[in-house]
Amino acid sequence: MITLITEQLQKQTLDELKCTRFSISLPLPDHADISNCGNPFQLVSEGASWRGLPHCSCAEFQDSLNFSYHPSGLSLHLRPPSRGSSPKEQPLSQVLRPEPPDPEKLPVPPAPPSKRHCRSLSVPVDLSRWQPVWRPAPSKLWTPIKHRGSGGGGGPQVPHQSPPKRVSSLRFLQAPSASSQCAPAHRPYSPPFFSLALAQDSSRPCATSPQSGSWESDAESLSPCPPQRRFSLSPSLGPQASRFLPSARSSPASSPELPWRPRGLRNLPRSRSQPCDLDARKTGVKRRHEEDPRRLRPSLDFDKMNQKPYSGGLCLQETAREGSSISPPWFMACSPPPLSASCSPTGGSSQVLSESEEEEEGAVRWGRQALSKRTLCQQDFGDLDLNLIEEN
């Protein structure tokens, strides 16, 4: 099989290659002069090769409707004849001349969006044709203002005047549209959320009627649209909403708490699309745990660390000399000698003392005990007992 294919390929030459023709229905001019390009009714058989075709820079017409072109030729553009010259005067070579593309007629690509262009908050160029299906989510941020201030605390409710119906309702009843100004009353739709920020460009203040759900321009409304940041998602806080914010002198028990405000917060509410920097809502963040105050480390007592038990010494000699009661050696090592014998004027005689003398004697005794601890039993810090430190 392979040998048959190779033999056929060797026998094949360029003369045997058939030309590929494109049949395109093309209307011809009525009386065109096509003498330069040969007979238009010339029949070309499919078996003819490229070398058999006459060398002509133009297309060859067949049956006055179909034409085949040279492989070296480019795409041909038919230019319509001008009004001043008749089709008889124009030869077909001028009619079928390739026309250079006009740079003015080329489609201009749109400019790339800027860095600050946000897709979620973008506004199209033609605001009148854009009617999105987006509606505000049923969250607490879109409740009417007249329902605010009815929650919260156990204190007495503060009575407030309900705002007029024209500016009270902020609920969107129908599909919003992106109109840059307040729409007239005959429009059957209401503006979206960012038209509140765009409405400050208009000369007349805007208001809404809750019956029809459409926004209208009214010069007799109480206040213009509240100025806010352009395309902001934060809820609009106008003069009506600022009346229900708690003042600096109010307490949580005296002023009602707003239902859309989270409990325990006293700052302005934030939208879901904006980052929230509240520590209470950060879950799963690793922090250094503070030390438990119930488990305190024992403080180091250097006076106890300096005590070193030993069998013989100055303290034992002093206590044996005074004839005190027998006590364990670790207790006698640093216990001061009893001062009853030294405090009495006569060596072993007992003496009845008054209360004031007993208090003075107790103070002198404590002072001597502290002095004896420092002088008799004090060791330098380089000679510490590790076992005693571990026990303490």
UniProtKB/Swiss-Prot annotation:
InterPro entries: FAM53. Residues 83-93, 203-215 have a biased composition (Polar residues). Residues 278-303 have a biased composition (Basic and acidic residues). Keywords: Acetylation, Phosphoprotein. It comes from Pongo abelii (Sumatran orangutan). GO terms for biological process: protein import into nucleus. Residues 77-120, 141-167, 203-303, 340-364 are annotated as: Disordered. GO terms for cellular component: nucleus. Coiled coil: none annotated. Belongs to the FAM53 family. The modification Phosphoserine is found at residues 122, 162, 232, 234, 255, 273, 299. The modification N-acetylmethionine is found at residue 1. This is Protein FAM53C.
